[in-house]
Every structure is written in C-alpha cells, then in structure tokens.
Amino acid sequence: MWLLLQLVWLCFLLSLGLNSWHQSKVPEYPDELRCGLRSFQFTINPLSQETETPPVLVAWDNHGLPHSLQNDSDCGTWVSEGPGSSLVGEASYSGCYVTEWESYYIMTVGIERAGVSGSGAFIETKLFKCPVNLPDVPNAGLCDSVPVWDRLPCAPSPITQGDCKQLGCCYNSEEVISCYYGNTVTSHCTQDGHFSIAVSRNVTSPPLLLNSVHLAFRNDSECKPVMATHTFVLFRFPFTTCGTTKQITGKQAVYENELVAARDVRTWSRGSITRDSTFRLQVSCSYSASSSALPVNVQVLTLPPPLPETQPGNLTLELKIAKDKRYRSYYTASDYPVVKLLRDPIYVEVSIHQRTDPSLELRLDQCWATPGADALLQPQWPLLVNGCPYTGDNYQTKLIPVWEASDLPFPSHYQRFSISTFSFVDSVAKRALKGPVYLHCSASVCQPAGTPSCVTLCPARRRRSSDIHFQNNTASISSKGPLILLQAIQDSSEKLHKYSRSPVDSQALWVAGLSGILIVGALFMSYLAIRKWR
C-alpha cells in the first residue's frame, strides 16, 4: 500500500508541473511590426537571450478559430527563423487571417514563448494593425542622408515604429530622436484641424533658401514657421487661418493652402540671373463633412455670465470600456478593435458628459449588443433590461456599484457593469457568426439623485423578456469601436485546420494513462498478496 501511495503522489506532482504551463504570468517583451504595401511584416523575439527555443505562433481566422501560423501560400503567410531564436513572419493583407476594419487591416496573433531557463511557457494575443492607405514613407536614402545633428523631431519619444511610419517619418530606435523628418516634404492633417508641413532644404537641387519659404496667401506672425533649423522648416497652423480655402465636394470638406519659396535674383544693368530652384507646394486635407472630427471655425468672444445651477439641455452620454476591473484606464478610439477571448470579462462604463449638476443621477434603461455599428441591427442580445441584468443569460451581466468614496467628481453621473464576452450564432446553421460585436445603451437622467424614485431595484427573478423598448426622454450611446471575440485555443470544440495540439497536452494524456496502469497494477498485486496471505 505504501508503494501505491508513492505512485499516486508522483503522478500528482507531475500533473502540477504540466499545469503550470497554463498558469504562468505573461511578461513584457519587445517585438517589431512593419506595415508593408501588401502585407504585415513582423519579428517576434524570444523572451530572453538565454532562451534557445523560438516562439510558436497561432493566428485566428474570420470564424474565431485558431490555426498554426506557418508557410502557406494559399493563406498568404510565411514564417522563418530569424537571428537569436526570433521568428520573422509575413501575412498578406488579402490572406486568411487578415480582416479589413474601417481604414485598417487587422490581424490577431497568439504567441507562445518558452520562459527563462525553462521556467514554463507564456501565451499572449497581439493585435497587428496597419492603415489601408499608407502615407508616403521616405525611403532609406532620404532618412540616412539627414545628419544626426540636423534631425528635426516628427513626434515626441517614446513612439512605436508603426505610429512613426503612419506620420510619414523616419524611424531609428537607437537614436535619441527616434522619429524624425526625412529629406523631403512631409505633411499631414491633424484631427484637431491643423496643417503640419515640414520642408527639407534638400528637397530640390540646388537646395532651397529656407528663410524664403512662406505661405503664398498670408505671411502674418501666426503663419510663420514654428520651428526652423539649418536643414528644415516646420509650419503648423489651423485650417481657419493663413489664407486656407475650403471647398465642399460631395460628402468631403477639402482645405487647401500653398507654400512657395522666393529665389535669390542677381541683377545688373544688362539682365538678371538666379541659381535657385523654383518651389511651389500645394497641400490639402480632406475630411468627411459629417464627421465629428471636422474642424469648426471658433471665435473667442467675451465670457458669458455664469450658467444657472439647473438648465434644460441635450443629454450627452459617453460609453467607455475599461482595461481592468478597477476602471483606472480605458480603451481609446485608436485601440479599437479590442480583442478578447470568449467568456473574458468586459468592464463597461456609461457616464453623463459635460454636466456638473450634482443632483443628476444617470439611469441605464436598456443595454444590448449587435454584430454591427447600427444599434437597430439584428440579431441583438440583451445585457440590461429596464436597468437590471437579463436573466435569460447563463452568464448574467453584473452591476458594479459606483461608491461615493471613489475619486470621481460626481459618482451619480456614472453607471458600471461587466459582461462575459460571447459570439452571435446563426439561428439556422447553429454556427458562430464571424465579425465584430458592438455595445449600445439607452439611458435617462433622474432628479434629485439618491431618492427612491431614482433607484433601480432588481428582484432576484425577473420575467425573461428580451424585448428592447425605448422610453421617452432617453438618449442612446454606443461603444467607440467593435470587440473581436476569439475562441480560446484550449476550449476549441471543433477540429482545427492546420493546428496541431500542444505537446504539453499529449504529455498530460501520457502521464494520466501511465498513472492509471500503475495504479491498477498496484491494486492487483495487493489483491494477490492478500489472497496468498489468507
């Protein structure tokens, strides 16, 4: 019997060692992404220089199912070993694992790495995102030809290579100024309605006279360069100044301006000459005429009298998704789409925007999810019904109290809840629908805050009604972007194409089988010994 106990204990220890592969914490690691003209080009580095095993890559298709990422010309993927146990990969924008969302190509990659000194394995999902219309990124010659002492910062550090390239600038992670302008003309339009134009003196041959470069229609003090060096001149000005013209073409609002450079002309009694290049640059920015990011002409006048304590006005709401249950940080518009595994928690916050009346209390009426940005799109799934969790869900929505002791200025202006992520299912084919999931809520404001009439009571059991009815005097709000929900590798119930099961799983099965044989054998030997003794 003592031998039997030893065998059982040995199997238990082996199982703990194998299970630690699933429980390790994911560390930080440096990786690189380059947005090519036709494909993602990325490098996945090992966790440590001491690690000799390269990471293992997994990609998810449009149905949320995982596949081993390997060389596959049909799916447009190529993977090879790089220096120092790293992996170099490429994925075509038109391949099996890339989705076009708004103005970006997106791809989710799962990375399994071996820990330092064989301490276990780590898995993390990584979202690759590249713009559909890439800006004109300067080539290596235009970047390397700028001396270090003449480099003009394009964006403050730290900045990723992808973000720097989106600005059309040069990138070198080993320099103090990692993102800088190349020897060309670099222009971009900001979301707050400004032109940003950098001109290199070497954009023409012979070089420009930088001190003569100016806006063609206005040369006021506010229209002069904001920065000038021996090699570069930088202009930054609003669309509403410096002679900028505006035209509405269809659904597009186009803002245009022009830069010119004077020439040094030498004159004598019999003629004039110049050795300078002709330079005339027209820049334009296009915005959707219906976009909320469209710049507006704002005039600053004398301050109006203070607003009364209570006044009628439009109800403006904001729906945000927090990065963790503490609600310390939130996903911004640039973070979408947010990638989550099925059943992962999503922490939602709805708040009253731009109101300072402490007597207001926000009440959530209905909250629901759709597979598209349209709040009325079908199918739908209820999250909150009349302010209470929908009881027809086996993973019910959880209401999260906003305490008075929180650091929020007006706690009654906030409502929070969490949901477990899910995927919509085709009611006919009984298969998970591909595509994103959007969240929506309708809400109203109650006064005075804290009174019984402003409190929503949720009984233990409610009628399973999933109909969404909008009440009068309510406002609706939607998430800033979609959620992409993936099927977990370990939970996949379907046979995965091109994906082999983890060697750890096969080892676990082998240990379990061997344990069973040893236990049965030990019991049988004990039985024979007892029978012989009798």
Swiss-Prot record:
Keywords: Cell membrane, Cleavage on pair of basic residues, Disulfide bond, Extracellular matrix, Fertilization, Glycoprotein, Membrane, Receptor, Secreted, Signal, Transmembrane, Transmembrane helix. One of its GO terms (molecular function) is structural constituent of egg coat. Residues 531-534 are cytoplasmic. Residues 462-534 form a propeptide. GO terms for cellular component: collagen-containing extracellular matrix; egg coat; extracellular region; plasma membrane; protein-containing complex. CDD domains: Trefoil (cd00111). Gene3D superfamilies: Spasmolytic Protein, domain 1, Zona pellucida, ZP-C domain, Zona pellucida, ZP-N domain. GO terms for biological process: binding of sperm to zona pellucida; prevention of polyspermy. It comes from Bos taurus. This is Zona pellucida sperm-binding protein 4. Expressed in oocytes. Its main location: membrane. PROSITE patterns: P_TREFOIL_1, P_TREFOIL_2, ZP_1, ZP_2. Residues 1-17 form the signal peptide.
